[in-house]
Amino acid sequence: MSRGKLEDMEQKETSEVDWIICFALIQSRNPTLWKRALSRKKGDVEDVGALKSEKNLKINPRENSKHIYKWVAPFENGFLNNKSLFAHLEPIYNFLCQNKYKSFEDAVGLKELQSFSKDVSTADINNWFLPRYKILLKILSLKTKEIDFRGLSQVFQTLQILLVSHYSHRIDSDSSFKRTLIDVHVFNFIAKFLFNRILLKKNQNDPKWLQNFYDQGDGKHLCDKVDYKRLCSLHFTLIYSIINIQLIKIKTNQTFEPQILKYVSVLKLIEHILIIIESLIHVLIRFVSKHKLICINRKKAYCRVYLERELSLKKTYLKNFYSVISGVPEKELGGLLKILKIVILSLLETFESIEWQHLKPFLEKFPAHEISLQKKRKYIQAALLITAERNLIARFRLSRWFNETENI
């Protein structure tokens, strides 16, 4: 036998040994994959066909639409009383079903997002969609095992995407809309929805179809216990999603200079929220000072920063918060204090969800805006240090927004 043939045989044997070792490793370390490989080997033609059909599987929009109607069945009188408006949710629900393994920002195209609210008026948003959004927000935040949240959660996400679409489009066409957005979905959400409606149970006026849902018939009333952390987390997703969509819009336009005003517009939106956070911390300081002595030592840097800022902080939100909570009964003060801390924490976490990398080129080119953000962050940190609330201080120190930030 020639030397060349011997070498070929040795290589073949070595190759076979390598494959045997490889298969043995798969069999021992991943039995599921091994069984799948065996079953595929037994029926190659059938399995290839199955794989192709699985890969090219098209989701039937009609089937999805049936599901969304099924999920709102317990609220038929409230959600299906206007089927022409409810129909606007169907394409959004189909979009969610087709992209359930992707993040919202990665899945949606800007034109597609705009199309979701194209034929929906602001009046329809305010009078029909928004009240139902708040109802589902409250229901999804209930501490109960009586409700299957899965379907309702999808309907809530559908409504939230509609709101993101509407507000993202309106901010571009109406410069005053930024303030409206923050006043309605941050300030009013905290002052009127959380403090008044949820904590103090004022102005509830729930429609009959909702009261029937809450009343379980065994003496239980489902709306008695709310998970405030979940409530804030669900709702503030709306805020950072709108900000992120605005940043993605700017990023997709390659011409930098015309986008300067849009960058500034997003920063103003962010600054409004920062003022609300600061105002809430000042409210917290007033509450804490009623129960324990707060010592402000002017020798400490953070105390000097706090006192300086106390004079210059815009009082609009601060006065409104004080006005709302001044009527809170003594027995509810403990609950109010708890909610205050949760809201502050949730808003700080919201800032971590903003896609700051999209703002980075602008902040580098115009450092004055970054300095302004750094200053506002310093004001918030100083106020938190005055409260001596360890959880809030620790969470804030660990947070990173637009840049690596030095602590006071």
Swiss-Prot record:
One of its GO terms (cellular component) is nucleus. It comes from the Eukaryota. It is found in: Nucleus; Chromosome. Keywords: Chromosome, DNA recombination, Meiosis, Nucleus, Sporulation. The keyword Nucleus applies. The keyword Zinc-finger does not apply. Its main location: nucleus. It holds the Pfam family Mei4. One of its GO terms (biological process) is meiotic DNA double-strand break formation. Disulfide bonds: none annotated. Required for meiotic induction of recombination, viable spore production and chromosome synapsis. Component of the MER2-MEI4-REC114 complex which seems to be required for meiotic double-strand break (DSB) formation. Interacts with MER2 and REC114. Component of the MER2-MEI4-REC114 complex. This is Meiosis-specific protein MEI4. It comes from Saccharomyces cerevisiae (strain ATCC 204508 / S288c) (Baker's yeast).
